[in-house]
């Protein structure tokens, strides 16, 4: 995938972010290939409101990769994946992780399949269904959700997918006190980690939830 249309600053921002996150720069090429596809398809399909490539690096790629250390192996379902976030950056940076991108919107699912095809991501599948309709109960070690719903909403539609010891990794902005308080009694918050996303201002938290 040709990323020659991207400015040197875009590459530099990504390399800097990978260094801060202690991730190998070998991922620069596939991540920029994904970014190039996202920019191209976004002109027609409006996959994301963010248009500036440098902002995309920070708010999409580096934000997704900030949770990479928590999901290096096993099977992961990315619920409401949208344009593939955080699922595709995680799959690129964790080749041993098997990722299912769950996205019911047809246009977004077509984009995801094209990314998988062009980047040759053998560890990624796309399920064009709503999370609650995915018939794969007790299959996944991890669920991710970046902008899908409240914690209660996420476990309601996708909790059945987790293995008994599996974890939901929900990406949030400010510390979600109210959402945590509203979790059903058979779910418990294992940890809340502040996320340091390179070049991003504003609060980010990763909430890890598991079944009791």
From Swiss-Prot:
Domain of life according to the entry: Bacteria
Cellular component, GO annotation: cytosol
Main localization of the protein described in the UniProt heading: cytoplasm
Catalytic activity: guanosine(527) in 16S rRNA + S-adenosyl-L-methionine = N(7)-methylguanosine(527) in 16S rRNA + S-adenosyl-L-homocysteine
Any Pfam family hit: GidB
Positions annotated to bind S-adenosyl-L-methionine: 80, 85, 131-132, 146
MF GO annotations: rRNA (guanine-N7-)-methyltransferase activity
Subcellular location per the Swiss-Prot or TrEMBL entry: Cytoplasm
Keyword Transferase set for record: yes
EC annotation from Swiss-Prot or TrEMBL: 2.1.1.170
Catalytic class of the enzyme: transferase
Gene3D superfamilies referenced in this protein's UniProt entry, alphabetically: Vaccinia Virus protein VP39
UniProt entry keywords in alphabetical sequence: Cytoplasm, Methyltransferase, rRNA processing, S-adenosyl-L-methionine, Transferase
Record's function text: Specifically methylates the N7 position of guanine in position 527 of 16S rRNA.
Family: Belongs to the methyltransferase superfamily. RNA methyltransferase RsmG family.
NCBIfam families documented for this protein: rsmG_gidB
Name this protein carries in UniProt: Ribosomal RNA small subunit methyltransferase G
Organism, scientific name: Xylella fastidiosa (strain 9a5c)
Gene: rsmG
